[in-house]
């Protein structure tokens, strides 16, 4: 019987493989790709926000389901409109949510992220995505 690899090495190996993330930040959908896993997320670029405390309530499919069905205290927003970033804060929150949802990342090590953005993005918007 072959000796088993220590659990630490197995976990570290899985983590190293999942350190890179590709994101297609589109006006309609956001797609997240992880090498050797493929597309792990393909959800609408929609965010639901609480007007009362200005907090993000849901992102993606759940937020899309809320369009037209929310009370006055909740708004749904598409942070990208006509190939441009309409709301930087909401776009940032959406990106963080999708990266976290893609999973497999330790909180103290940031993944390498490649983000594809709409062609009509301005230099200011490009800088905001990079930050």
Which role does the model predict for each range below?
Residues 2-131:
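Nucleotide/phosphate-binding catalytic cleft detector across ATP-hydrolyzing
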